[in-house]
Amino acid sequence: MFVNLHTNSYYNFLNSALSPKKLVNLAINDQQKAVAITDPNLFGAVEFFITCKQNNIKPIIGLNLTVEYQKNDVKLLLIAKSNKGFQTLNKIALIQQKLEINSLVDQLTDIAVIICSLTTWKSTYKDVYQAKGIEINQTPIAILANAVNCEKTNSDQVVLTVLKQMKQNQTGKITTFDWDLKQKLNQISINENLKVKSEIQPFLDQKTAQQLFSETELNNLNDLVNRCELDLEHLKAASLSLTDNDAAVLESLCQTNLKQFLDKNQDLNKKAYQLRLEKELNVINKLNFASYFLVVNDLVNYAFKKDILIGSGRGSAVGSLVAFLLNITKIDPVQHQLIFERFISTHRQDLPDIDIDIMENKRAEMINYLFEKYGKENCAQIVTFQRFKTRSAVKEVAKLFNDYGISDMILGVLPKDQTITFTDLKATEDSALQLCLQQFGLIVELALAIVDFPRQSSIHASGIVIASNSLIKTIPLLQLDNNHFLTQVSMEWLSFFNLNKFDLLGLINLTMISDVITQIKPSNQTVNQFLNTISWTDQNTFINLVNEDTLGIFQLESFGMKKLLVQIKPKTINQLAIVLALYRPGAQDNINLFINRLHNGYDQSDIDPRILPIVKNTYGVLIFQEQIINIVKVVANYSLEEADSFRRAISKKDVKLIQKNKRNFFERAVQNNFDLKTTTKIFSYIERFANYGFNLSHALGYALLSYWTAWLKTNYPVYFYLWLLNHFQSSKDKQKLIIRTLEKSGIEIYPPLLNKAQPNSVIENKKIYLGLNLIKGINDRYIQNLQKVQHLIQTQNNLQLTDVVSWCLDKTIGDIPLKDLLLLKTMGCFDFFEYTYDFNDAKDFWIKSDHLLFTRMPLEKKDSNFWIKQFFTN
């Protein structure tokens, strides 16, 4: 039985056309019992292992490595013989520099080592092995320890198999096309133009292998394969545990916080909250998730302690009372009738997933806190992969053919669907597309073939994993420049190891909210305390939104959003959530229906009275997933957990799955006294909207965040716009829009006066004084020098304009070129004098005062067009 043992996947970036799934399919199609992945990294190892197990193929995981021996590079293939061997590979993969072979051997445990070239073997080890009296050509297996003076390593730990006896083949492809594709990927990686096709190196099938290799050689190969036994299931991380009894600690925290909450809100139904809390804790403890909530609670407490602003909540976690009581979210799920089962359910074994929005400029601090608290080796950020999209694939392949300009034409006729295949394209009747394929079919075919191929690794924007012990025992890692670890396993495969994932998303809007509140809050209040005093029902805030005053408002700046705000005219957070939920692909098809019913009413008799209360607030239009869950619960008497499972099944658009759930739904609906006609109508209603339903929990969390920004803009507009001016300094278009909006708002703008101007814009007496950073052509060095001039201005008595100009031009002080000095004058930087001046003879005016033409021009407000012209016109 032959096994392809030296195989690269496409995680050896731009060096293979084979995904882990394709590797496994090759083995299946040829009835090979095993297959290997041996990239120079372990990015694809876990995906490969899981795919093999799902298809009854034996997975062999290896690492392609270049080591140094006597100042020569030697290519080795390290194969994990066991879970311990896989952990050894993890340790080696963490070392990101070339190893000397002696130091490598010191680390090898349960590893088979294969020399990748017999020529390399002979030239590199000839002297060593002759001295040891070993006949290479007659010895199918040699002990590496004897070759490199590491006698402590025994043959069960390190085995080096001579390739003359194994003739191990390196995988290239299934077909000629796949090998061609590999060559194109190689050329993309080194930015080369198209070369002559290389020799085809096929993925060997059983028949060919039997012809090429002797029985002894195949037996040696099978002997090695049989000794490789991986079961990564046994490497799954132990459950995260923070205390002796995390469940009891969590319950105590929640009960204490619930009592405080109810004491402040005496009118609430205490029993309803208590029952809800007990239900949630029961599910959380049953699934052993208490520690997860305690970690997030501790992180939130750290944020409050440091006055770091976190978001109002995102995703289905907003539907949890436990999360609300732990200050992880800000929306009361009982009052807003949110569904916990949408977040966590005993019907799903998924680990909880709480996404936390934090201030963008504090994310690194929060991550450092986690690494310090739980241990550097127990935490890691998560890898992600930048993959080819249709656009980038077409451009790169066209470049290989020296057809730089043709890519735009091809992209102009290609469908936007990222999943479309070349076969699909050939079957279309679009004449322009067919003409394109006739002329550039090879470019299109190759480009579509590499869509979704990984191009390089990167760091996931938010994900972090935390374990109870060292992650290196479980998964492969890399080390980042800041000494933090990065997983070599991407997000979608980490759940296999039972690792707790946390998402910390940096949000610039939270930074803005915090910065603005810092300017306006009383000195004895924190930012978080001030935020808690903001009324959620300020009608002036909603009026401004309806008046399309949404510049700088979270999620509401686009033209479409402004139009929808005018049409719906929200007056509450809940109505704002509807706006956010409707303005999405798919859901937008319901906007006209909703608007029409909102303003003109609708026939409620057309809706079964038993489900009318569920859809009444959205005028009979299904907008939220929670509505579907509640309808299914009422009609078919499902539990909330069952109803959410039903919703998930329907939204997947899997015909077989839909039919299976449909039968069960109808049976239970009839048992619950719904007739067939009504049930059919309701099911059709659900099926139509299920794919577009939005998560109400998420919509409310983000609606509150939108409201916070709108409230600050309405009540403290000067500070709000000041932040926008300073934040968007690099965007001229944004700056123009801000300045024009300032004028409409009646806020006065003044020039960056040289006697007090700061690099950034500042507020004084409710007026905005523009910053030096906004002046075109004035760089950081100029600003530093102008601050020297400013110091002299502030300390000089009997100040004269000629003094200031002299300091500006003096190479030891200001060193400002004359043309830039004139720019400062035009910008009004000298307007702090009683008079301003018209510089007729600019070259000599600062020396000879009689060359100055005095024109009385008191400091005055300029209109927006003046500032836009001066700041942004080159």
UniProtKB/Swiss-Prot annotation:
Localization (cell): Cytoplasm
Catalytic reactions on record: DNA(n) + a 2'-deoxyribonucleoside 5'-triphosphate = DNA(n+1) + diphosphate
CC per GO annotation: cytoplasm
Cross-referenced Pfam families: DNA_pol3_alpha, DNA_pol3_finger, HHH_6, PHP
The organism's place on the tree of life at top rank: Bacteria
Main location: cytoplasm
EC number(s) from the headed UniProt entry: 2.7.7.7
GO molecular function: 3'-5' exonuclease activity; DNA-directed DNA polymerase activity
Keywords for this protein: Cytoplasm, DNA replication, DNA-directed DNA polymerase, Nucleotidyltransferase, Transferase
Gene Ontology terms: biological process: DNA replication
Family, similarity comment: Belongs to the DNA polymerase type-C family. DnaE subfamily.
Function: DNA polymerase III is a complex, multichain enzyme responsible for most of the replicative synthesis in bacteria. This DNA polymerase also exhibits 3' to 5' exonuclease activity. The alpha chain is the DNA polymerase.
Oligomer status and interactors: DNA polymerase III contains a core (composed of alpha, epsilon and theta chains) that associates with a tau subunit. This core dimerizes to form the PolIII' complex. PolIII' associates with the gamma complex (composed of gamma, delta, delta', psi and chi chains) and with the beta chain to form the complete DNA polymerase III complex.
Protein name: DNA polymerase III subunit alpha
